[in-house]
A protein has these predicted regions:
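Conserved RecA-like helicase ATPase core segment
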Residues: 2, 45, 277-370, 374, ...
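Conserved helicase NTPase motor core
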Residues: 7-19, 23-31, 65, 85, ...
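Helicase P-loop NTPase motor core
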Residues: 26-39, 323-325, 332-425, 579-581, ...
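Conserved P-loop NTPase-based nucleic-acid remodeling module centered on helicase motor cores
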Residues: 55-172, 316, 632, 654-657
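Accessory C-terminal helicase-associated subdomains
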Residues: 222-225, 453-515, 523, 538, ...
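Conserved non-catalytic scaffold segment of RNase H-like nuclease domains
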Residues: 512-515, 521-620, 626-627, 649, ...
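C-terminal accessory regions
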Residues: 682, 803-808, 831-896
């Protein structure tokens, strides 16, 4: 590596990692060794040596880590790296399935609560009651996990890639064996699958003569689990719904069977110790066969996610795969030596890490009195107060420092938070139910989601429930399903009180002349780019009327010769027209187009784009607007999505092929208009078939009350927001933040949602930390397009390392603290029985608790306090004496 090309911050251990350009490599690094920085430097190094962004893949465990990686890449690399995929494995799978048309375009992703709601509907149980009851909720999760288990069984996945093998319990096995013996069939995988698909038919087995009660209970539990798991699977399939684990399973199966899927020659994977077997298998399938560059980065000391399927053995496997290319980052750039001595001694003695492989510090700052302390409290209750007092002291003495109280359970966080609140200590709690998982915040995000994509059925379901149109998500889902069968959209009830979108189109198609048009432009920015060709053809009843219009327009903006990896046909045509003197000025061409349209409705494929770039060109060159002409606009993309809702792609080229329509999608406006007319004729045929059913449904006396409530509670808010989608904001507030605030205020004043005291955290984070790309116009539509997917993956922990957070005291669980860093850390209740947990049943669980303790300690950058209570009052009033966790034995000498 040329030294003058690189920042001096790279140390001698990091440089070989950055330079690695082929083969499989494993980087093992403790916290503070600069992993995120070298990930970004590797991208710069590879890019400078000709690796294309679209051939790179950067994967990590959490969305938060992916966002941090993206921010670091922006600082190190700069420029436009939008072709570079940075995200967690689920994000990659979602992007692949949707963008590559591998699943229907109207598919939606459901979260855990929505999955529970679906099953609760089959069980005739109150979905909210289930969510509030931990034990019932856990039972529902078992059903969901079992459905994935059966999917993997049916698709013959290797056992090591099973996501939830524990969902098929020993009792389940005994139940299946009994059924097989009773039915005289062989006990094997196919028998399990067969019983699963016919669970109700085997219910009589429970009542077999002579069957003991224990076996009967086993069979009953298994068969009901199978029945509801099958119901859940069928519901998802029928409604094009995918839960998060489906994203992994479907992607794995597609990549396993289709050699044409894109493989990546350059991959780096962070936090590899947290990935489960299926995620690693997917990464292997994504890897190009011909001499790939794959870099894994991890830390076996921080492997604490076994409850999500991660295994410590993963690093053992990767060490064998990467033999000869294992790198140890041995310079810690974050922790002072006195803290690193604590971490390293602990890693060596408790985690059995070779001392030679542990990092040294480049920070020789000496510890001052009290930087490392053990806090002894008389009781748990006293410990809450003592920790609060300590946190308050740190807060008052060190105005720039941040302090975290790290706990092992959500209930601990609640009690610490209560103690801090009592003394007026402002703090931020990251534990328990996440702010982004609360119904009110989900409702606000659903509002943004339907503005971004009005075909998002899950978001509409949440809105219908939240607007009190339906009492449950289950009823709202059924209503949405019926709308889909009838080519109706929920927005029809808000925009067309006695009609619907397809009916309005059909009326115009039959009774009026429609101008079908298309534009070719210098780019995709509707606010800044120019139209260079505009073409139009009039039709009535599907027949062409009069002469076509095809105008070429001069521009001073560059025209790209290539559109991605394809030639741009407009490049040569435009320059031919320019040489022949056949280009019109923008004002003349636009005025001729408006004259051609007159008062007729217009139609385009993906009309939102064409209409709004036309509107902005009119403003720029004619001091005019589309709104001033009050021209109705239809969109063949919206029409065909309503009328044929299960297609995988709605690009014009794909639709021509799918329906065998006349025309060619050449990206020349006049050709695209002719192709769109073919599609419009098909839409009219399909709309005609639905019209009578639509009218009957819209005017049905049982439907009207629901529609009226939805219209009354949401119609005005929705219409106002839709009208603002492409309006540039004139103030400094991001348009998306303004819309979120306006929706909250409207819903709250109407009594539709409760106060959200912490909404300001979200608004500040969006304003200061997320909506930072200055190339994205300050209008709602482009900001939604750029950010809505990221917004829907936010968690409270994202706030902790952000610029927007004002608090300097945090209360967090160990798992949510992972990846964060604080000046001061106080570990709560570090007593024997909590670390390791007294309820652990295996050595592996004790070892994971030891790693959890390491993760908690290593969040500290300056001070580390270990707290515990000398006594605890148990449930029945018995006082129990307690000892400091035995995990402290190797390092207690450093404290006090």
């Amino acid at each position: 590596m040329e030294a003058n090309n690189y920042t001096p911050s790279l140390d001698k251990y990091q440089i070989p990692v950055v330079e690695a350009s082929q083969g499989y490599h494993l980087v093992l690094a403790s916290p503070g060794c600069g992993k995120t920085h070298i990930l970004a430097e590797r991208i710069r190094y590879a890019r400078e040596r000709g690796v294309k962004y679209e051939d790179m893949l950067c994967l990590t465990f959490t969305n938060r880590a992916a966002r941090e990686m993206t921010n670091r890449i922006q600082k190190v690399v700069g420029g436009d790296f939008s072709e570079l995929m940075v995200g967690n494995v689920h994000r990659f799978c979602s992007k692949f399935l949707f963008e590559q048309g591998r699943i229907p375009a109207d598919s939606a992703i459901i979260d855990d609560e929505e999955a529970v709601s679906i099953i609760a509907d089959y069980r005739n149980e109150d979905e909210e009651g289930v969510t509030r009851d931990f034990n019932r909720y856990k039972g529902y999760q078992t059903i969901i996990f079992f459905q994935h288990f059966i999917y993997q069984l049916e698709h013959q996945h290797p056992w090591k890639y099973y996501l939830h093998p524990e969902s098929f319990t020993d009792d389940d096995r005994e139940a299946v064996k009994h059924i097989c013996a009773s039915q005289k069939i062989e006990y094997d995988e196919q028998a399990v699958v067969n019983i699963y698909h016919h669970a109700q038919e085997y219910m009589d087995e429970v009542n077999a003569p002579g069957l003991d009660g224990k076996t009967a209970d086993r069979i009953r539990v298994l068969l009901w689990k199978m029945y509801y798991a099958n119901c859940y699977a069928r519901y998802k399939e029928e409604n094009h719904l995918f839960d998060f684990e489906d994203l992994l399973l479907y992607t794995y199966d597609i990549y396993r069977s289709d050699p044409t899927c894109k493989r990546y020659p350059w991959i780096q994977v962070d936090e590899v110790q947290d990935l489960n077997g299926m995620q690693l298998a997917i990464i292997d399938l994504l890897t190009a066969e011909d001499n790939p560059m794959v870099m894994y980065l991890g830390d076996e000391q921080q492997a604490i996610f076994s409850f999500m399927g991660a295994k410590v053995e993963t690093l053992t496997l990767l060490k064998m795969r990467c033999k000869g290319n294992i790198h140890h980052l041995q310079r810690n750039h974050r922790s002072p030596k006195y803290l690193l001595d604590v971490f390293n001694d602990y890693a060596e003695k408790q985690l059995k890490i070779d001392r030679e492989l542990l990092p040294l510090s480049d920070n020789d700052t000496k510890a001052t009195s009290g930087d490392l302390r053990i806090i002894h409290s008389s009781t748990i209750e006293a410990e809450h107060k003592d920790i609060t007092t300590e946190a308050l002291s740190l807060y008052e003495q060190n105005k720039e420092e941040r302090t975290a109280v790290i706990v092992s359970a959500n209930s601990d966080a609640d009690r610490i938070s209560e103690a801090m609140t009592e003394v007026g200590l402002t703090h931020f709690k990251v534990s328990g139910r996440d702010l982004f998982d609360t119904p009110d915040v989900k409702l606000l995000l659903a509002h943004l989601s339907v503005l971004s994509n009005e075909h998002n059925s899950i978001a509409w379901t949440r809105i219908m429930k939240g607007m009190h149109a339906f009492p449950s998500h289950a009823l709202a889902r059924r209503f949405n399903w019926k709308l889909k069968q009838l080519a109706l959209s929920p927005s029809d009830f808000l925009l067309y009180p006695e009609s619907c979108y397809t009916a309005e189109f059909l009326r115009a198609y039959n009774e009026e002349e429609i101008v079908v048009f298309d534009t070719e432009t210098t780019g995709l920015n509707v606010f800044q780019d120019d139209i260079i060709e505009i073409a139009a053809i009039r039709i009535k009843g599907g027949e062409v009327v009069g002469e076509p219009l095809d105008l070429y327009i001069e521009t001073d903006k560059p025209i790209l010769p290539m559109l991605g990896d394809k030639e741009n046909p407009m490049y040569a045509i435009y320059h031919e027209k320019m040489s022949a003197g056949e280009l019109l000025s923008p004002s003349e061409a636009l005025q001729r187009f408006l004259a051609y349209v007159g008062t007729s409705p217009i139609l385009a494929h993906n009309a939102n784009y064409d209409y709004n770039i036309l509107d902005n060109n009119l403003q720029r060159y004619c001091n005019d607007t589309m709104q001033a002409h009050d021209i109705r606009c239809f969109d063949s993309l919206k029409l065909i999505r309503l009328l044929a809702p299960s297609l995988h792609s709605y690009k014009l080229e794909s639709l021509l092929e799918t329906f065998q329509l006349a025309g060619v999608n050449s990206h020349q406006a006049i050709d695209d208009v002719k192709a769109t007319i073919s599609l419009v004729r098909l839409c009219a045929e399909k709309a005609r078939e639905k019209q009578a059913q639509q009218e009957a449904f819209i005017h049905h006396p049982k439907v009207k009350p629901f529609a009226n409530v939805l219209r009354s509670n949401y119609g005005e808010r929705y219409r106002e927001a839709v009208n603002r989608l492409y309006k540039l904001s004139t103030d400094h507030e991001p348009a998306l933040v303004s819309e979120l605030s306006a929706a909250y205020n409207a819903f709250r004043s109407d009594g539709l949602i409760n106060d959200i005291p912490r909404l300001d955290y979200i608004l500040r984070y969006l304003r200061i930390d997320m909506l930072t790309d200055e190339t994205v116009a300050n209008a709602l539509a482009p900001q939604l397009s750029q950010y809505v997917m990221d917004i829907n993956t936010l968690k409270e922990a994202d706030f902790c390392n952000s610029k927007s957070i004002l608090e300097r005291i945090y209360v967090t669980t160990v798992h949510k603290a992972k990846g964060l860093e604080f000046d001061n850390v106080i570990i709560f209740d570090a007593a024997d029985g909590r670390y390791p947990n007294a309820y652990n049943k295996t050595r592996q669980q004790d070892e994971e608790d030891a790693r959890k303790f390491y993760v908690a300690m290593s969040r500290a950058k300056r001070r580390l306090f270990i707290a515990y209570a000398l006594q605890k009052v148990e449930r029945y009033g018995r006082v129990v004496n307690r000892e400091l966790t035995p995990l402290m034995e190797a390092i207690s000498k450093y404290f006090n």
